[in-house]
Amino acid sequence: MIYQEENQHLRIGLASPEEIRGWAERTLPNGEVVGRITEPYTLHYKTHKPEKDGLFCERIFGPIKSGICACGKYRSIENQREYSKICEQCGVEFTESRVRRYRMGYIELACPVTHVWYLKRLPSYIANLLAKPLKELESLVYCDLFLARPIAKKPTLLKLRGLFKYEDQSWKEIFPRFFSPRGFEAFQDREVATGGNAIEKGLASLNLQIVMDRAYMEWRNLTEQKSTGNEWEDRKIQRRKDLLVRRMELAKNFLQTNMKPEWMVLSLLPVLPPELRPMIELGEGELITSDLNELYRRVIYRNNTLLDFLARGRSTPGGLVVCQKRLVQEAVDALIDNGIRGQPMRDSHNRAYKSFSDLIEGKEGRFRENLLGKRVDYSGRSVIVAGPYLPLHECGLPKEMAVELFQAFVIRGLIGRYLAPNLRAAKSMIQDKEPIIWKILKEVIQGHPVLLNRAPTLHRLGIQAFEPILVEGRAIRLHPLVCAGFNADFDGDQMAVHIPLSLEAQVEARLLMFSHTNLLSPVTGNPVSVPSQDMLLGIYVSTIRSNRGIYQNQYHPYDYRNKNFSYKMFYFHSYDDILKAEKQKQINLHSPLWLRWQVDLHIVTSIDREVPIEIQYESLGTSSQIYENYQFRKNRKEKILSMYICTTAGRILFNQQIEEAIQGFFEVSQHRSRPLPAIIA
């Protein structure tokens, strides 16, 4: 937690070993430094009291009961004398028990351990920075392979280079004759590395600026290359370019945040406060505990065993030490993310342990359940339904919800107009739902934007601003086109409504967050508000035309007995004539018809050189050329006298709606009597 300008905010990132030690280590009033956990014990099996230097140690995490030490002595917390702050016998501070909710401990690992999130999660940050295959790094992390010359800049005695197996270490039988035990250990750490130690040395030796420059040079060379014509090779080159871009971004982020890549390898393991991984006593002395305690115990057991092996020196076989390092790595992996490598660790009942990742991820995790799901004032929640009649920037707010959200504004309006003498009378009028309330409410919400949010808010478009209008019912009405930004649909989804109170918040909502100003994706730049699902189906149904079109009045081979099968196509001169005929049931939405069109307008057709279906000549020399979607009437000099296009009433209505949205309703109503400049034919 970071405190800056009296505002608390949370920053998640890599922590250095010094930071981890600073979280946990404390100096007691008697000068003793506590914080390191060395014993894998929790509670004593008889007394059920925390074991010293264990996972519930009161010296490290604080007393279980406020003001009472481990040996049962009581001191007043308000007494600030120096000798009363700590028990001289057990070393427990006389303080409040709530400190056990935030005081941490740490485990000093006998060997560096790679953080499994940065190794196994995709993309693998460690593999990206080291430019090594993930399988090769996994074999190195879990001690299946050894790395010779881990620090390339230093001179070495061995001629080995790169990776090799444990069986290839013939030098281990020769070099001990020329070194003292300590000298041989120093030589071995310098020349050969495996496990997290090898990864740590490789990351520490990186120059991030050089990594960025080399990745950029290679990316530029690949970009300048022309296409090979081979689809497989082009895909391979594109994948390589994407990898280089990710490497440059990763190195840039490390440089900007002043974090070091070697911090992705743990040498100190933080231990959560005991109140966050409790052990509870049930009846008859039975205990239930968090899975994290069992996983921490396994780490400490294996770490202490490795410490014993290393303390014995050369008397311990090298293969045993290597095997124990792998066990420590696997124990830490299970603690952080159990099952990420395949088969998870299980208890005696064959139940997989819940790791740290299981506790924080998902809908019921620590972040979404406890930190992000808080209720706030001036907010509400309801189901969303479609409101296709609404403009893009408006939403339908139920009256029952609006009067609660804007209650403070309504009360101010009632008292300001002397309709209510005091606060109590104004609230009584609102509860009785007097008619004057709705009038004032309409005035209050006019020009006052509201914020709609749909959880989870994964990107900027997850919360947008709208102008509210009052609607009946209890559901929030929303235009279907804005659902894509929220990733919402009308199958029972809920949305939260928030009221921006300050003038600054309202201005920000109006200028930056209105839905009609967020039509493009901030990530890709592609349109977000596009028709989909029932909108596309409705547009298709309203603009569909009979399959036979102008051929309906020709002989039909399947209905030769039906003499009334021939269909007469009507001719119209304006939009209004078509709409009147449709209302009078003379035509339907899908009936083909001829609409008079302006001669000087160009007709777009899918056929470049279309041949007329029929040509009719009249006695005065005029002629009519009939095509599939339009027809001309010409004089003797081939001058076009009139033109008609084949369309439907449904397409006329659809085109009219588009024009009203673009030009405005009043402008369209003034020019509706004459043919409009565009139509779907």
Swiss-Prot record:
Cofactor(s) named in the record: Mg(2+); Zn(2+)
UniProt xrefs under Gene3D superfamilies: 1.10.40.90, 2.40.40.20, RNA polymerase II, clamp domain, RNA polymerase Rpb1, domain 3
Gene Ontology biological process terms, A to Z: DNA-templated transcription
InterPro entries the UniProt entry points to: DNA-dir_RpoC_beta_prime (IPR045867), RNA_pol_asu (IPR000722), RNA_pol_N (IPR006592), RNA_pol_Rpb1_1 (IPR007080), RNA_pol_Rpb1_3_sf (IPR042102), RNA_pol_Rpb1_clamp_domain (IPR044893), RNApol_RpoC1 (IPR034678)
Main location as per UniProt: plastid
Keywords per UniProt: Chloroplast, DNA-directed RNA polymerase, Magnesium, Metal-binding, Nucleotidyltransferase, Plastid, Transcription, Transferase, Zinc
Catalytic activity: RNA(n) + a ribonucleoside 5'-triphosphate = RNA(n+1) + diphosphate
Binding, Zn(2+): C69, C71, C87, C90
An annotated GO cellular component: chloroplast
Keyword check for Lipoprotein: no
The keyword Nucleus is assigned to this record: no
Cofactor: binding comment: Binds 1 Mg(2+) ion per subunit.
The protein's Enzyme Commission number: 2.7.7.6
Superkingdom in the source lineage: Eukaryota
Gene Ontology MF: a single term: magnesium ion binding
Compartments where found: Plastid, Chloroplast
Binding site for Mg(2+): D489, D491, D493
Residues spanning the membrane: none
Alphabetized SMART domains for the sequence: RPOLA_N
PANTHER family noted in UniProt: DNA-DIRECTED RNA POLYMERASE (PTHR19376), DNA-DIRECTED RNA POLYMERASE SUBUNIT BETA (PTHR19376:SF54)
Subunit structure: In plastids the minimal PEP RNA polymerase catalytic core is composed of four subunits: alpha, beta, beta', and beta''. When a (nuclear-encoded) sigma factor is associated with the core the holoenzyme is formed, which can initiate transcription.
Chain's role: DNA-dependent RNA polymerase catalyzes the transcription of DNA into RNA using the four ribonucleoside triphosphates as substrates.
Family note: Belongs to the RNA polymerase beta' chain family. RpoC1 subfamily.
Protein name: DNA-directed RNA polymerase subunit beta'
